[in-house]
């Protein structure tokens, strides 16, 4: 269950009342943002990585929004986790305290090199320890106590976010991206194209959809 809060409890109660076992395929149950017909998902992923390689933060709004409190790549702000200043840059955009770190999204097949214990956590529900390489090279996604709240993306995940991570890894040798929710502190998530336009104009952050 990708929503450990009250909304998840209500869904669980509804499932119990329904009386049948539900197969949970993914956490994307919200509003759908239609992808532009002028480019393929691969072209979109390549454009996003090119933007990130310029040391810029960007938003992504793909397909259906996530159900639950975690941004899992369909309504996310993403950035390079390696730069020592990136945490401050994203916190400034989101109007959060500077000390607060962000979550990592990692290609599942490389997670064991960066996090321990090595857990499969596609819904960002586990806090684990960063390995030595993480503590030394990925300061933007590590808490003060050396832990990280991780999202793993498996090789069977046919999402644009997986493509972004694969291309990012190919270009940088780093299979990890900083991932946080596509909203500003105290405001709702970007949900549709109109929200994305407003976000871009107000906060000067490119949103890809």
Model-derived regions, located:
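Flexible beta->alpha loop and helix N-cap segments adjacent to enzyme active/binding sites
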Residues: 1-209
């Amino acid at each position: 269950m990708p929503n450990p809060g009250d909304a998840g409890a209500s869904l669980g109660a509804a499932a119990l009342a329904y009386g049948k076992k539900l197969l949970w395929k993914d956490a994307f149950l919200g509003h759908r943002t239609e992808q532009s017909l002028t480019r393929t998902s691969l072209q979109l992923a390549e454009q996003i990585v090119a933007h990130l390689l310029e040391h810029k933060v960007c938003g992504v709004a793909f397909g259906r929004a996530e159900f639950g409190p975690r941004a899992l790549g369909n309504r996310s702000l993403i950035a390079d986790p390696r730069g020592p200043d990136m945490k401050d840059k994203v916190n400034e955009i989101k109007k959060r305290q500077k000390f607060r770190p962000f979550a990592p999204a990692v290609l599942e097949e490389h997670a064991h090199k960066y996090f321990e214990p090595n857990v499969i956590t596609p819904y960002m529900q586990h806090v684990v320890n960063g390995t030595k390489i993480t503590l030394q090279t990925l300061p933007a996604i590590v808490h003060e106590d050396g832990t990280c709240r991780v999202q793993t993306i498996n090789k069977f995940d046919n999402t644009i976010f997986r493509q972004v991570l694969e291309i990012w890894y190919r270009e940088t040798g780093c299979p990890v991206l900083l991932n946080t929710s596509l909203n500003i502190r105290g405001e709702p998530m970007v949900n549709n194209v109109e929200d994305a336009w407003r976000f871009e104009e107000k906060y000067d952050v490119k949103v890809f959809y």
